[in-house]
Amino acid sequence: MLKRVFLSLLVLIGLLLLTVLGLDRWMSWKTAPYIYDELQDLPYRQVGVVLGTAKYYRTGVINQYYRYRIQGAINAYNSGKVNYLLLSGDNALQSYNEPMTMRKDLIAAGVDPSDIVLDYAGFRTLDSIVRTRKVFDTNDFIIITQRFHCERALFIALHMGIQAQCYAVPSPKDMLSVRIREFAARFGALADLYIFKREPRFLGPLVPIPAMHQVPEDAQGYPAVTPEQLLELQKKQGK
């Protein structure tokens, strides 16, 4: 009896792993036509969306994923592949501001501040992609991130009827742990899209691109997110 239960458990685990692997491969296959590894092959679009991540690890070492995304954004902008850069990242806490950090580094690299737009409510990939259309009134854009992230972001875009392509910037050599976490992230994205039908945490007023944008001088300022929405989030975070 115990042996039968053990074998059944092994079969169940095996089927689950095969399902997760199959869904992972399906997502990669479905989005492959929209991913560009070479800048010269990338089509022109008015807006490039840079997906945020932390600049530094907790150890203080610079995050290579961040570095490659910023360099990719600089290359796409300087080559004329995009005219505007929408920096979408997490700013749920006043002490952590992904869009502002990206903005400072891009300006230091020569990007015109007037060509930079900030999205402080890109808490998840789904938020960033859907808000680009529903808040920033842009339905055809270039996503800038690593290939594995391109696949998930594009899958969300395709499901939502959003026309997007992705510029796949390099990944660090040692990315095994990140790739393993990506399995869970993709499974979560599928659940969000097909089961929970999730929308972005915040939407907010329409902020078309191009337009005149108020750019804050410090880590404050939350365009396209109302103060009431941010207060609600900070209460949930216990801040």
Curated annotation (Swiss-Prot):
Transmembrane recorded as keyword: yes
Name the keywords, alphabetized: Cell inner membrane, Cell membrane, Membrane, Transmembrane, Transmembrane helix
Q: Which residues lie on this side of the membrane: Periplasmic?
A: 24-239
Q: Which GO terms describe its cellular component?
A: plasma membrane
TM segment ranges: 7-23
Question: What this chain does, per the record?
Answer: Participates in the barrier function of the cell envelope.
Write the protein's name: Protein SanA
The scientific name of the source species is: Escherichia coli (strain K12)
Gene name of this polypeptide: sanA
